[in-house]
């Protein structure tokens, strides 16, 4: 019964929740305050948004306008502008020392001197959240990294992502910021690309390097869960962003956009997603009960 009570209080018009509210990214104190927000689902994530991808009705919202670092969720926009540029996906790109992360010192098995096609780099960036792959995509963009980032921000503006800023292509910078409202818009746009749908949801992928075959797995453990029908997804993590997850998934008879930001603990975002799925199945099993746009 609690779920039915929740629905009446959280079902909002998509346009109302998605209105632009310019904010600075919260610090530690503000992030702690976000977690104290009224949340009948008791989600671990500081920020959550669940919307019907077809009717654009918001089924659940928790701090949806808060602006936070988004970590590797950034890579979706990196791939979007790469695909929209119409670049040769079979062009071979060499990993260089410019792709090494000296900021967070993250590790990578893509060694300088290794060669991969742009298609392979897109696959690794989306599925395995490979930072050097995303860096190489930005570096090989026409005009270089700066031009790629500029286009990412232009694309965000064209999608009315008014609380979003991109500083680089991997998500390692805390200056890559957005809100759940904006990220939902990005996911809805990204799902139009068959390559993003396929590559982001592949459970595993292998590439050949000078040292042999490199095997990668999807960073989202829900991909292998038969109870989930995930169409687009991306995970993200840096300390300043917490554990993040965005998905477009079919739950029951509904196509949903799910955004979760700033969860604590490696499994918390997935547990939140499971709780959301149970909530939607309990209170909103059919799109027939909702007006369409």
Feature-to-residue mapping (PLM):
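N-terminal secretory targeting signals
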Residues: 1-47, 51-57, 278, 282-293
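Generic alpha-helix initiation/capping and coil-helix boundary signal
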Residues: 2, 6-8, 118, 149, ...
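Hydrophobic alpha-helical segments and their boundary regions
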Residues: 4, 8-9, 41, 93, ...
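A residue-level detector for conformationally permissive "hinge/kink" positions
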Residues: 5-7, 48, 105, 163, ...
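Secondary-structure junction/capping motif
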Residues: 16, 105, 117, 144, ...
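Active-site-adjacent loops and short helices of periplasmic peptidoglycan-processing enzymes
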Residues: 25-181, 185-194
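Domain-terminus/edge residues, biased toward the C-terminal soluble/receptor-binding domains
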Residues: 161-165, 173-293
